[in-house]
């Protein structure tokens, strides 16, 4: 990792923070704000992490690195090769064609020979590792961060979690948050769809303790590989070897039968008793909301090893944009060829970071026949982690670049019709809070591949439309229309909820189809109608398509307000991840925050911003 830091420093991608900062909130808050700066800000190396304990200050001799993945330039420096070249190699690997001549035969042989790098190579443990075992183990000796005020404690956030099947034939590398309970116990937040969870059930059925090893640091590519959505049974270190074109070198663990990369900075080893679960959380997650307290497995730590000059790698997740934007971009680009094997007419896809990946995806396809887009929708919803996508919008090959925000939105709105909107139900991410049931909820697929027959509405200005609608729905506060020149303008309406569901009250507006097309209701107290970036983030987070959509002849009403019992939503509705103002003021006093108010207004760092009438 230190070689990578030298590279970051050389390219002006690293900021070193020598000011002592607390592992509780201060470090994470500063990294959170840095990641929201233009182009992802800098990677931050905190050289003096501290923890206040019983009126004393504990200092750590281990620096903390954050926002390491948080820019396109840092991704390029990490990969050492253009992402486009990696994508082409993946494409070639997945589509071997029969050779037409001797030269092509030689090329195929070379490509096959290059695959020798995918298998990890066993090596001895480095002799200079410092090792603590049994009673010497103390997780509090690591600068583990508490990232959010309402978190249940400190969490390891960039741990590479190594597991294997009961018969040792399958190995897995994943990345899950890990809550520190005490000096030798960690909570393992793996969800129902993770490979390690499948292994866990094998061990539980056999009534055998499950070995787990957690590595931190080393080559940062290990960490990204831990997040890669590979098919079940394919070991993520094989992907590492494919990208690096060299074998991952793995060393044996001391207290369990697993192996981890020998260059990692920190290794935590132990076993999980599959019959014991402990409450884990809450935790401010990548959705920008806190996930609730739930029972999860617990790792009993037997051994901790680390380098003399080890660096603790961490991240902070919450409201976008953050460094997971860039990690997700690499996933999106590299796995396009793999996704195309399931959907051959797929040209491109895009996961906007304010859709927090599983909440929104845009896809461009070669449309060949009627309902082709709906066929691809079902293909997406049946493939790996794509099955957790809540909202998918499909456009034709003549559509603009998917990342050209205004152009692609206008294209979609010209082609949208309620007849080509498919509302379905299926598995969803366990972190989704809007679904009525855990890990299962509504899905919305929109076929915007061809021109709509929906007539253009008769436009009113915002003030005239507001007066008209307030007469029929008194809890409307303000509204703003977006893309009024299109066939399907979007009217965002802020409301104050009282004693009835918004969808029920929206029926009072069905008589205004002449002026309305897509209508989205949001909470007045927590939404700035002039901030479309944060509006989209809240909207796709807060809806369940089966419950929260009402349609009429030409109108499409969406309730993106917070839900409760009046909406027949009986699960706890979470709070947003907001920075502590006390911590922010402390960071300001230390001279570490600049342009905070601008970023706060833009990305709702400390609280949600509502709109005043004079602002519209």
Swiss-Prot record:
Gene3D superfamilies: UbiD C-terminal domain-like. One of its GO terms (biological process) is ubiquinone biosynthetic process. GO terms for molecular function: 3-octaprenyl-4-hydroxybenzoate carboxy-lyase activity. It comes from the Bacteria. Pfam families: UbiD, UbiD_C, UbiD_N. GO terms for cellular component: cytosol. Belongs to the UbiD family. PANTHER family: 3-OCTAPRENYL-4-HYDROXYBENZOATE CARBOXY-LYASE-RELATED (PTHR30108), FERULIC ACID DECARBOXYLASE 1 (PTHR30108:SF17). This is Uncharacterized protein jhp_0985. It comes from Helicobacter pylori (strain J99 / ATCC 700824) (Campylobacter pylori J99).
